[in-house]
Amino acid sequence: MKRPRAPSGSDGESDGPIDVGQENDLSQMARPLTTPSPSQMQARKKRRGIIEKRRRDRINSSLSELRRLVPTAFEKQGSSKLEKAEVLQMTVDHLKMLHASGGTGFFDARALAVDFRSIGFRECLTEVIRYLGVLEGPSSHADPVRIRLLSHLKSYAAEMEPSPTTTSALAFPVWPWSFLHSCPGLPSLNSQLAILGRVPGPVLPSISSPPYPISALRSAPVHRPAGTIPPTRRNLLPSRGVTSTQRAHLPERPAAPPPTALDARAARSIVPIPPCSPTTAPGAGKSDDNVSGSISSPCPSGPTGRPAGAVFYHSWVSEITEIGAF
């Protein structure tokens, strides 16, 4: 749009049209910045509401955690609804108490475990009450089963208080021996339990130990008659070397018949020698009943590696010594 310029008295100015359309365009562009449209205003209000709701949710979540963690606030939950200012005040008082006590109660693992158990039970009780109310509706408040159930749970929750027993009385019982015997890969479990202090060290079971204390084995008699050993166990026990200090009485072995052509003096001075001719103990010539275990010498052996004519025999002494040494 062009309009003619008004005539002026000066001759130096040129007469020509002036463009005014650009001014109208600038005025139309500046109008939305001052007055937003209704859709933009609605979107802005919606964003503000979402941000404010998130902020309130964070505050309420933190306050609910404080109600659960602070003991005084947790105990007053059932009686009446706590305000936010009361919860904050109880939190401040609790922190002051912990700071004054040096934090000893805060780091007590057993007290924390008992406290969290009580808190968890009460939360479960609250969830049960809420679920029954949602499932049955308002008409279920007079249900006798519901009343008895809630009464029992509330009375049990009221009785849940920390017991004065010490942590040493809460040790776990010893595991069954059959379980340890069936698991040969657990030899290091005994040392771990002994370090924890839950099971006394001398009574710990091992893979090859019987289910009674080791001290009872060490006090057992060293010499035991061979006749008291059951024949089945005598045949099943493996053969072990017997030292000179732990020898047991062996049964009488068949000896070769003495020569008949010698006189009485020679017969009294000669000791009967078995076919395998082992090196016998010094007192073997006095009595045949006191023959002890001997050191093996080169002689013919049986199919199992034992000397010919040897008897399957095992004494309790070697087993006791090996168990005690283990």
Swiss-Prot record:
Residues 1-56, 223-260, 272-306 are annotated as: Disordered. Residues 42-111 are annotated as: Transcriptional repression and interaction with NCOR1 and SIN3A. GO terms for molecular function: AF-1 domain binding; DNA-binding transcription activator activity, RNA polymerase II-specific; DNA-binding transcription factor activity; DNA-binding transcription repressor activity, RNA polymerase II-specific; protein homodimerization activity; RNA polymerase II cis-regulatory region sequence-specific DNA binding; sequence-specific DNA binding. One of its GO terms (cellular component) is nucleus. One of its GO terms (biological process) is cardiac epithelial to mesenchymal transition. CDD domains: bHLH-O_HEYL. Residues 292-305 have a biased composition (Low complexity). The keyword Nucleus applies. Residues 43-98 form the bHLH domain. Residues 116-153 form the Orange domain. Its main location: nucleus. Keywords: Developmental protein, DNA-binding, Notch signaling pathway, Nucleus, Repressor, Transcription, Transcription regulation. Gene3D superfamilies: 6.10.250.980, Helix-loop-helix DNA-binding domain. InterPro entries: bHLH_dom, HES_HEY, HLH_DNA-bd_sf, Orange_dom. Expressed in heart and at lower levels in brain, lung, muscle, ovary and testis. Interacts with HES1, HDAC1, NCOR1 and SIN3A. Self-associates. Interacts with GATA4, GATA6, HEY1 and HEY2. Transcriptional repressor which binds preferentially to the canonical E box sequence 5'-CACGTG-3'. Downstream effector of Notch signaling required for cardiovascular development. Specifically required for the Notch-induced endocardial epithelial to mesenchymal transition, which is itself criticial for cardiac valve and septum development. Represses transcription by the cardiac transcriptional activators GATA4 and GATA6. Belongs to the HEY family. This is Hairy/enhancer-of-split related with YRPW motif-like protein. The lineage of its organism: Eukaryota, Metazoa, Chordata, Craniata, Vertebrata. The gene is Heyl.
